[in-house]
């Protein structure tokens, strides 16, 4: 990929993206036909009169057709007090400070669950730290607990001899599996409705409350048991 040296106008060029990316109509007609119009585009709200418009203007002029079916207009990222970030105000946040401390996934999770994607998001460094501690440390501790004891027991998830059918599992195991199934279905339904923030909050509530605070705490002694049993294998699986 090389940068195009000849640019007539940045908005005209960006508006041609739906077909220019394939060098259509000069070649790749099959690739163009397979992807036009695209299912979804996403940019910040300021692109309403920018890229969103230029794409549609060029497409309707050239093809008499839309070039995208859905559009998500993202809200801007503001400081923790809801004010526009500005170097002159000294309220700009360097993302690398948090990449190096809490990790990129913590920032992604915080930004996803903080507010609806189409709404402005107030970026609070304390919120990133809270997401890291609440969601990711919890996940890590749950994994570490299971992995340590599974390693001591030589547990192999692919071993059919230690697999326990659902109907033979304890009420606690069937409860957490039911909660996980319900959460997954609700997660999918919210994604279909573009309620990504609500889906993320539901997943976090499941991990922290149902899985860690309730299920794992009540299952520790089952894994501490040095004797192999149906109940222990059920918990390991």
Residue ranges of predicted features:
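Structured secondary-structure scaffolds
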Residues: 1-152, 176-219, 223-224
């Amino acid at each position: 990929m090389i940068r195009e040296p000849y640019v007539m106008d940045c908005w005209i060029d960006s508006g041609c993206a739906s077909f220019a990316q394939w060098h259509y109509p000069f070649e790749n007609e099959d690739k163009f036909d397979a992807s036009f119009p695209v299912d979804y585009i996403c940019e910040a709200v300021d692109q309403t009169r920018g890229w969103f418009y230029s794409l549609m203007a060029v497409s309707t002029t050239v093809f008499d057709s839309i070039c995208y079916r859905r559009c998500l207009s993202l809200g801007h990222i503001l400081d923790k007090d809801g004010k526009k970030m500005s170097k002159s105000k000294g309220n700009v946040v360097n993302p690398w400070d948090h990449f190096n401390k809490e990790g990129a996934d913590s920032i992604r999770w915080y930004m996803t669950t903080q507010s609806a994607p189409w709404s402005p998001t107030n970026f609070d460094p304390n919120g990133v730290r809270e997401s890291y501690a609440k969601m990711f440390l919890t996940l890590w501790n749950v994994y570490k607990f299971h992995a340590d004891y599974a390693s001591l027991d030589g547990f192999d998830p692919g071993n059919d001899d230690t697999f326990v059918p659902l109907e033979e599992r304890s009420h606690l195991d069937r409860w957490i599996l039911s909660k996980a199934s319900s959460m997954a279905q609700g997660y999918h339904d919210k994604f279909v409705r573009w309620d990504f923030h609500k889906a993320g909050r539901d997943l976090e509530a499941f991990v922290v409350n149902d899985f860690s605070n309730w299920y794992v705490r009540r299952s520790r002694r089952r894994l501490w048991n040095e004797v192999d049993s149906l109940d222990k294998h059920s918990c390991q699986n």
